[in-house]
Amino acid sequence: MDYTVSSLQCFFLVLCLSLLVCSNSETSYKSNKKPILINFGDSNSDTGGVLAGVGLPIGLPHGITFFHRGTGRLGDGRLIVDFYCEHLKMTYLSPYLDSLSPNFKRGVNFAVSGATALPIFSFPLAIQIRQFVHFKNRSQELISSGRRDLIDDNGFRNALYMIDIGQNDLLLALYDSNLTYAPVVEKIPSMLLEIKKAIQTVYLYGGRKFWVHNTGPLGCAPKELAIHLHNDSDLDPIGCFRVHNEVAKAFNKGLLSLCNELRSQFKDATLVYVDIYSIKYKLSADFKLYGFVDPLMACCGYGGRPNNYDRKATCGQPGSTICRDVTKAIVWDGVHYTEAANRFVVDAVLTNRYSYPKNSLDRFW
């Protein structure tokens, strides 16, 4: 009897040790997965694509706050995607079009300023997706030849694919319709179709993790308020263009529906919809609460109040000036957010209160 009890004790001890070893091995494996980000988009997340792609000079004062030089980013410093990289303890994303000193080991950025979901300009979403397919295929070829500084097949499979696009489509449609709601809304399904095809293509090539930003409150941009004649009835309670924000909300509603549809279609994929609109609108509405000033004024521009924006002297052009304290400004150049505002947005995103389904960046690896 004593021998039997001792054997059972030994058996359970060995079993527990085995489970512990397996558990530790699994934990170690998960912790060793390094985050990889692959981004598609426009100027909201362009880290130098337009500079490399078309040679458009974007120098100081752009970049003055953090990089202290022009990097191709349209802003005074870091973008949302840069703060994501910092949070994940990885280097900033190199533009796909950068031919001089790119680092593609932990990701790549296909975003180009001015890009649209529809095939309107040089680097629309469909072209960015084609570039991705070529990049993936070429990376595999080079790795098979001995290269070790690129994303391997497992890396592409475990990468997070981020999409932030659509604002330029909506603005162009608004301009074409003389700021009329109905004609713009009629074009939204075609915009969403391009995003759908993009996600489907990435999925076809092995992508299983998606992070999709909706579009922000376009009607709160100082540029829009400055270039379009309007009266008080055109504005909402915080002074933003109603029609701009209404079309943005219509687009976002359709984008959320699309994400839900694709989530049902791709059972083995994770697709997170991030409500950037709500974060940015809250910042503009409650700016004093968060230590900001003048939400409807460009920090870098010309003309003074109410919007400090003039097409003849935009940020960086002769005559333009920079506000006294950029850390308290929300909008940098009339369109793009300041580094301080981008940090606010990322801090809000990382609470998981604005993502559907609720998911954090850290949980993807």
Curated annotation (Swiss-Prot):
Question: Signal peptide span per the entry?
Answer: 1-25
Q: Gene3D superfamilies, from UniProt?
A: SGNH hydrolase (3.40.50.1110)
In Gene Ontology terms, what is a biological process of this protein?
A: lipid catabolic process
Which keywords does UniProt give here?
Glycoprotein, Hydrolase, Lipid degradation, Lipid metabolism, Secreted, Signal
One Pfam family this sequence matches: Lipase_GDSL
InterPro entries linked? GDSL, SGNH_hydro_sf, SGNH_plant_lipase-like
Keyword Lipid metabolism recorded: yes
CDD domains linked to this entry: SGNH_plant_lipase_like
Glycosylation positions? N137, N178, N231
Q: Where is it localised? A: Secreted
Record EC number: 3.1.1.-
Please state what class of enzyme this protein is.
hydrolase
Question: What protein does this entry describe?
Answer: GDSL esterase/lipase At3g62280
Naturally occurring in which organism (per UniProt): Arabidopsis thaliana
